[in-house]
Amino acid sequence: VRVAVAEGLPVYILDLNRPLLDKMVAAAHTLDPDALEKTKHAKNPNWKIVSGKEEIGAGENRMELYPLRGASTERQYMVYFPESHLLYASDTLALNGDGGLYDPELMHEVAQAVERAKIKVDTVFAMHQGPMPWSQVLALIEKSQRI
C-alpha cells in the first residue's frame, strides 16, 4: 500500500479500513526510509473508498467490487468479473487436507454477499486457493452446515 501511495496510484480501500490505512501511510519510516518516506507527495493517498458496489474499467475485463460485510469478513471485499462470471473471494477460501473448507463461515459470508449482489458466479478463486467451480464451494458450505 505504501508503495502504491508513493507512486500516486489510486488505491481501492474498504470504507471501514480507512482509519487504519491512514495511520499506516502517516507513519514515519525514518530508520530505513521506504519509497513513501522519500517521496515529496508522501502522506497524500489517492484513496478510492469502497462502501458499496464499485465498477472499475470497461469491456470484458471490467471488475465490480462488493464489500462482504459479514461478521468475520467485515473488512474485506470481493472482486467480480461479470463477463466471465469469475469471483475473487479475498482471503476467505482455503481447503483442508481432506478437501473440506478450512473456515466454512468465511465462505458462507461470501455466498451471502453473492446472493445480496445478485451476481452469477461460475468460478471462484482466492488468495490461498486456485480457481474452482462455485457449485463445488456451495456444496462444501452445505456439507459443513450438516456436520
Model-predicted regions and their roles:
Residues 5-7, 16-144:
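Metallo-beta-lactamase
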